[in-house]
């Protein structure tokens, strides 16, 4: 989900969905439904659309939910919403996924620099490799939470994930704790130093 337009009065949440039909014999007609809830579990908007997916094929669909008076995500107030996506055959749910999102507006201005929800923000951060001493790359979530809290208490508001793919748990913590993330996958991007290296995953991760 993304929020290209977001103010304290109203926000547009755009949701991109790809649905796969693994049946090899016939097309499948389904309904895609998205429901957005605030942090108290109150529904703030929904959208649904019918579509037909070819046998052994996939279909992409984009939906929009308009939220009035949204609680915007910021460094000081990292408000989050829960987005529930359902794939339905008739009234029966055949698949679903839950996504946590923040509603915010990001802008880069040639004179003012980085703007978050219309306010100028100076990024004060660190490079952070995905490792933690004796535990290596298998970093427990509580350890990440402790380290991020120490950084935030020291005035840090941003993290660059230097040369490593961050875990979803790490990114979720940053969302929850109000920390900006410069999500660098790895220093090779599409141009690998070796034939079989990180760069082979670049397209998949960027998507």
Language-model features and meaning:
Residues 1-181, 206-207:
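Secreted/periplasmic carbohydrate-active enzymes, especially glycoside hydrolases
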Residues 124, 186-207:
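Active-site-adjacent "subsite" loops/lids of carbohydrate-active enzymes
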């Amino acid at each position: 989900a993304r929020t290209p337009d977001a103010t304290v009065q109203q926000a547009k949440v755009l949701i991109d969905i790809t649905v796969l039909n693994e049946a090899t014999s016939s097309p499948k007609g389904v309904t895609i439904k998205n429901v957005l809830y605030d942090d108290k579990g109150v529904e703030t908007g929904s959208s649904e659309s019918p579509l037909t997916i070819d046998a052994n094929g996939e279909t992409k669909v984009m939906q929009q939910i308009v939220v009035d008076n949204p609680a915007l995500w910021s460094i000081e107030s990292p408000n989050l919403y829960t987005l529930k996506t359902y794939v339905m055959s008739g009234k029966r749910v055949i698949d679903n996924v839950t996504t946590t999102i923040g509603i915010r507006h990001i802008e880069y201005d040639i004179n003012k620099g980085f703007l978050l929800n219309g306010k100028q923000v100076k990024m004060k951060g660190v490079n952070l490799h995905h490792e933690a001493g004796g535990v290596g790359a298998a970093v427990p979530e509580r350890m990440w939470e402790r380290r991020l809290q120490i950084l935030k208490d020291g005035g840090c508001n941003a993290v660059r994930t230097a040369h490593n793919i961050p875990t979803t748990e790490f990114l979720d913590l940053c969302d929850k704790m109000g920390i900006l993330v410069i999500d660098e996958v790895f220093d090779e991007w599409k141009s690998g130093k070796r034939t079989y290296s990180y760069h082979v995953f670049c397209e998949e991760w960027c998507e």
